[in-house]
Curated annotation (Swiss-Prot):
Binds 1 [4Fe-4S] cluster. The cluster is coordinated with 3 cysteines and an exchangeable S-adenosyl-L-methionine. CDD domains: Radical_SAM. Belongs to the radical SAM superfamily. CofG family. NCBIfam families: F420_cofG, PRK06245.1. Consists of two subunits, CofG and CofH. This is 7,8-didemethyl-8-hydroxy-5-deazariboflavin synthase. HAMAP family: FO_synth_sub1 (MF_01611). It comes from Methanoculleus marisnigri (strain ATCC 35101 / DSM 1498 / JR1). Its EC number is 4.3.1.32. One of its GO terms (molecular function) is 7,8-didemethyl-8-hydroxy-5-deazariboflavin synthase activity.
Length: 331
């Protein structure tokens, strides 16, 4: 009998800007254009170098959606020498590759052409679907229109980009909405074969936001959503939970087979009140299962060659490194 495997990625989390065109009712990440709203290139490079020294394999670039739509942002970025946020993330992706880190970008809504450009320097990319429902929390967030998000996930499939998506629980959606969201994701994967993993993420209320007093999903509700995801999604799509946002050890038996990216250096800037578990805690969460490190591009996509030629030497080198005999998971 094969031992169950739970995977994770060792990453660096780089929030390139907190400026965002959306105003979601549950978000504490967004800020206006102001001093310090852009991660300085020197800080980004220091973070990449320190993370590589700690054995990380992934550089997770996250930033607010369409920050250039917010007045004053592009002028501020221009003073750093970049025309727009995509120029900046492209430059830092190259810097990550040079330091033996595989880039994964989560940028919010991107056009087909923008996805195609970033595909050259990213091993994988992501966009949370969140929900197919029209919920009040997204009333002031044009980028959270479900049709717009589905179109981007589909475009990523057309471009054969290994992709992460997911659902967000507790933002005003119903159980039927969750099922519909998962079926949409499953259908996109059956058509394009590009969804690596689906995150089942629970909403965490933030002080000072419109939803600070909203009810949160309990463990049974989260577990039921995980089980539903495992039932609906194709077998080759991983079901992931963020191990810092819920009682992961209680949920692991519901169908979870991935614990996402965790960092030995950087915090979760979207949920800063929830620290990442470190390796010993991940082992405890995995229980009797084998805890196995992975890259941000899953093995089946490496085998299929679904990556830019620029990334091939690094992908091969890192895949060999994490598979080396005697290497402890995450060492």
């Amino acid at each position: 009998m094969h031992r169950r495997v739970i995977t994770f990625s060792k990453n660096a989390f780089l929030p390139l800007t907190t400026v965002c065109q959306n105003r979601c009712g549950y978000c504490c990440f967004r800020t206006p254009v102001r001093e310090g709203c852009v991660m300085a290139p020197t800080e980004a490079i220091r973070t990449l170098e320190a993370s590589a020294a700690l054995g990380c394999t992934e550089a997770l670039f996250t930033f607010g959606e369409r920050p250039g739509a917010v007045p004053g942002f592009n002028e501020m970025l221009g003073r750093l020498g970049y025309a727009d946020i995509l120029d900046y993330v492209y430059h830092l992706s190259l810097a990550a590759i040079e330091r033996d880190l595989l880039p994964h970008t989560n940028a919010g809504i991107l056009t087909y052409a923008e996805l195609d450009r970033l595909r050259e320097v990213n091993a994988s990319m992501g966009l949370m679907l969140e929900t197919t429902a029209d919920v009040p929390a997204h009333r002031n967030s044009p980028g959270k229109d479900p049709a717009v998000r589905i179109e981007m996930i589909e475009n990523a499939g057309k471009l054969s980009i290994p992709f992460t998506t997911g659902i967000l629980l507790g933002i005003g959606e119903t159980e039927d909405d969750r099922e519909e969201s998962l079926r949409v994701i499953a259908d996109l994967h059956r058509r394009y074969g590009h969804i690596q993993e689906v995150i089942v993420q629970n909403f965490c209320p933030k002080p000072g936001t419109a939803m600070e007093g909203a009810a949160v999903p309990g463990p049974d509700e989260i577990g039921a959503a995980i089980s539903l995801a495992r039932e609906i999604l194709p077998a080759d799509v991983a079901v992931q939970i963020p191990p810092n946002l819920a009682d992961a050890s209680r949920l692991i038996g519901c169908g979870v087979n991935d614990l996402g990216g965790v960092s030995p250096l950087t915090i979760d800037y979207v949920n800063p009140e929830h620290p990442w578990p470190q390796l010993d805690e991940l082992r405890r969460i995995a229980g009797d299962a084998e805890l196995r490190e992975r890259l941000c591009i899953y093995p089946q996509y490496i085998e299929k060659g679904r990556y830019s030629p620029l990334l091939e030497p690094l992908i091969r080198r890192l895949a060999e490194r994490i598979a080396a005999p005697g290497r402890d998971a995450g060492a």
